[in-house]
Design a protein with these regions (language model features):
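Residue patterns forming the tRNA-binding/recognition surfaces of aminoacyl-tRNA synthetases
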Residues: 1-72, 107, 142, 146, ...
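Alpha-helical recognition segments enriched in aromatics with Gly/Pro capping
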Residues: 59-63, 67-214
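Conserved nucleotide- and phosphate/pyrophosphate-binding catalytic cores
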Residues: 223, 243-246
């Protein structure tokens, strides 16, 4: 398939002001805190410092529709609803922009949009209780796509940060060294691992990975930990049998 780039009109969000909100939050309050701090804090701030304007329109079949309508002359009307856009257009015939929002734009609103925020109300019981939340656990590959954008959007729209701590996990890779996915068919069923090697062996294998590091799946290592666990089990049984306890 030939991929041919073309010029087209898109919707952008100017990021200068949003970026500054996140950078000032980190500089003045040290938030959010990254675990592990190295290298993720530096990666996060460096990306913000070099941030470009964000293209938020996508030519996809699914997603949140862009709330913009056009009349026959090409004038644009941005509104919460089609009826409101029609009022702004003084009853002119309108058609909605066919594009949808970038999924990360929608996801950036998650911290507060799920807590009763409707675009105006910024004080609900859920918002007071859960924003900011204690911690977000996420992969290092979406620090830019999700974490930074949640910080910027939450700070901009409701005036506080979305979470205090970000716990960064590694990515689980298949035996081929690529991220596990259904499309690659390189995933493993953890239940099968439990049945084959035991829960303890699988847990030891996962616990042996350095914090925040990627995991390249290796059945041989799990088998090694199973053999080790068997030795501990047999040694414990021997001690208990000879101590008169069961």
């Amino acid at each position: 398939t030939i991929v041919e780039p073309i010029l087209s009109e898109q919707w952008f969000v100017k990021m200068d002001g949003l970026r500054d909100l996140a950078l000032v939050l980190m500089e003045n309050e040290g938030l959010p805190r990254f675990w592990p701090e190295v290298p993720h804090k530096k990666v996060y701030t460096s990306w913000l410092e070099n941030l470009k304007d964000w293209t938020i329109s996508r030519q996809l079949w699914w997603g949140h529709r862009i709330p913009a309508w056009y009349d026959e002359a090409g004038n644009v009307y941005v509104a919460e609803t089609e009826s409101r856009a029609s009022e702004l257009a003084l009853g002119k015939s309108l058609h909605q922009d066919p594009d949808v929002l970038d999924t990360w734009f929608s996801s950036a609103l998650w911290a507060f949009a799920t807590m009763g925020w409707d675009g105006e109300v910024v004080e609900t019981e859920d918002l007071r209780t859960f924003v900011p939340t204690d911690a977000l656990v996420t992969g290092r590959d979406i620090i830019f796509l999700w974490v930074s954008r949640m910080v910027m959007m939450t700070k901009k729209l409701i005036g506080c940060h979305p979470f205090n701590d970000v716990i960064v996990t590694g990515t689980v890779l298949g035996k081929d060294g690529k991220p596990m996915s259904k499309s690659r068919n390189n995933g493993v069923d953890p239940i099968e691992m439990f049945d084959k090697y035991g829960v303890d062996a699988t847990r030891i294998y996962l616990a042996s990975i350095a914090t925040g590091a990627d995991i390249r799946w290796n059945d041989l290592l799990i088998e090694t930990y199973r053999n080790f666990a068997n030795k501990i089990w047999n040694a414990a049984r021997f001690c208990l049998l000879n101590s008169g306890r069961s």
